[in-house]
C-alpha cells in the first residue's frame, strides 16, 4: 500500500506540474499519456502484471493470446505468408504484453524466424517477456522505439487502443476539446472544455451533445510506420469499428474505457494510475491514414473471419475439448469474434 501511495503521489506531482505549465488545463491526450506511460509512475511503469486471466492474479484485463494459444498459432499462418512475400525472416512486435503472443508465434514459425524484435516501453512487461521467451533468447531482441528502417512483418495486438487520444465534445452545436483541470476545493481532477477548430473526420448527424475520440497518436504512429517500413507488412488486431459505426449518432458518449481487476468503467479521472485507459479504434480512419502515408490496405475483417480464413478449425482437429472450447471464445460473436478486427497494411508490392 505504501508503494502504491508513493506512486500515486509521484504521478499526482507530475500531473500538477504539467497543469501548471499548461496554465491549469491539460489536453486529455497529454493526461492519458502521462497516466499510462510516465516513467516510474505511470500505469504501465508500476503495474507489475496488468495482463492475466483472473483478478486474483492482480491483473486488470485479458488478451486473446491468454484466452487461447491457438490465437498466435493461427495468426502465424498469415505472418508466415507475409514473411514469404516480403522475403524477410524478421518479426517485429509492438507492445508484446506478457510475451504470450511472441511465444506462440516463435513456437509455430520455428526456424522461419531468425530475429524477433519487441518494442516495449514497460520495464515490468519486458521482464515478463524475457522470462517467458528465455527458450528463444538467441532470436529475441528488445527495442525502445521503432527502428529507422524496417524490413519485417509487424504485429500489434491491442496496441492502437492504448495510444492517447484527444477528446472532442460537441455542446449546443459548438465543438470543444475536452481537457483536465484540478479543483482545489474538492481535491479532485475534473473535466473542462475549450472551443476548438478540430472536428471529427465525418459529420455527426443531429444537433445533440456528442463526445468522441480523435486518435492523434495512432495516426502519428501510422505515418511513422509508413516512413520506416521498407519491406514487409503489418497486422493490427484490436477492438473497434469502421467509421460509420464508430461515429454513429447514438454513440454519443464516445468509447473511452478504463479497466481494473477485470471490471470496466468510463471515468479516467478516478483511481488515476491504478487502471488502464483505452479507446476503441476507428479502423476506417487508421486505414485511410496509412494509405495517405503511402501504405496499402491489404486486408480488413473481423477477428473471427480472419482466424477462420487462416484455418483455425483445421488446426483444432487434434486439439482437446478444453482447447477447442477456449479457442471458440476467439471467434464467437458475443466474445471476441466480432468486436475485434484485424487490419493488414503494407507496401503495394508485398
Q: Each predicted region: which residue ranges?
A:
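A short SAM/SAH-binding and catalytic strip from SAM-dependent methyltransferases
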Residues: 149-172, 211-216, 220, 228-235
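Short helix/loop capping segments that flank catalytic or ligand/cofactor-binding pockets
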Residues: 44-45, 163-165, 245
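Rossmann-like AdoMet
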Residues: 1-94, 98-150, 305-311, 329-347
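A mobile, often basic/glycine-rich helix-loop segment
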Residues: 155-202, 249-259
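Long, Lys/Arg- and hydrophobic-enriched amphipathic alpha-helices
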Residues: 200-347
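Active-site flanking residues adjacent to catalytic metal/cofactor-binding acidic residues
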Residues: 92, 119, 154-157, 237
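A residue-level signal for conserved active-site and pocket-lining positions in enzyme catalytic cores
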Residues: 35, 154, 286
Amino acid at each position: 500500500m505504501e508503494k502504491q501511495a508513493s506512486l500515486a503521489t509521484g504521478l499526482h506531482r507530475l500531473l500538477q506540474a504539467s497543469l501548471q505549465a499548461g496554465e491549469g488545463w491539460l489536453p486529455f491526450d497529454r493526461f492519458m499519456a502521462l497516466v499510462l506511460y510516465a516513467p516510474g509512475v505511470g500505469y504501465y511503469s508500476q503495474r507489475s502484471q496488468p495482463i492475466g486471466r483472473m483478478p486474483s492474479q492482480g491483473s486488470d484485463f485479458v488478451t486473446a493470446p491468454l484466452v487461447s494459444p491457438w490465437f498466435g498459432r493461427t495468426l502465424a499462418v498469415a505472418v508466415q505468408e507475409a514473411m514469404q512475400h516480403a522475403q524477410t525472416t524478421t518479426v517485429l512486435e509492438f507492445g508484446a504484453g506478457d510475451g504470450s503472443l511472441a511465444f506462440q508465434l516463435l513456437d509455430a514459425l520455428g526456424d522461419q524466424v531468425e530475429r524477433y524484435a519487441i518494442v516495449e516501453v514497460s520495464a515490468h512487461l519486458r521482464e515478463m517477456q524475457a522470462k517467458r521467451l528465455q527458450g528463444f533468447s538467441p532470436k529475441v531482441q528488445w527495442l525502445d522505439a521503432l527502428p529507422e528502417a524496417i524490413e519485417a512483418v509487424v504485429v500489434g495486438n491491442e496496441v492502437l487502443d492504448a495510444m492517447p487520444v484527444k477528446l472532442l465534445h460537441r455542446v449546443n452545436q459548438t465543438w470543444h476539446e475536452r481537457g483536465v483541470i484540478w479543483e482545489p476545493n474538492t481535491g479532485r481532477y475534473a473535466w473542462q472544455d475549450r472551443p476548438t477548430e478540430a472536428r471529427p473526420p465525418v459529420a455527426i448527424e443531429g444537433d445533440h451533445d456528442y463526445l468522441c475520440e480523435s486518435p492523434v497518436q495512432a495516426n502519428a504512429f501510422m505515418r511513422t510506420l509508413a516512413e520506416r517500413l521498407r519491406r514487409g507488412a503489418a497486422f493490427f488486431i484490436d477492438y473497434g469499428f469502421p467509421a460509420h459505426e464508430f461515429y454513429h449518432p447514438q454513440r454519443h458518449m464516445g468509447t473511452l474505457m478504463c479497466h481494473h481487476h477485470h471490471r470496466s468503467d468510463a471515468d479516467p479521472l478516478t483511481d488515476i494510475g491504478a487502471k488502464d485507459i483505452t479507446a476503441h479504434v476507428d479502423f476506417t480512419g487508421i486505414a485511410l491514414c496509412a494509405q495517405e502515408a503511402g501504405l496499402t490496405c491489404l486486408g480488413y475483417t473481423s477477428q473471427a473471419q480472419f482466424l477462420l480464413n487462416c484455418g483455425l478449425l483445421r488446426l483444432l482437429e487434434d486439439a482437446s475439448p478444453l482447447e477447442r472450447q477456449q479457442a471458440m471464445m476467439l471467434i464467437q460473436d458475443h466474445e471476441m469474434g466480432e468486436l475485434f478486427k484485424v487490419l493488414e497494411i503494407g507496401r503495394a508490392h508485398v
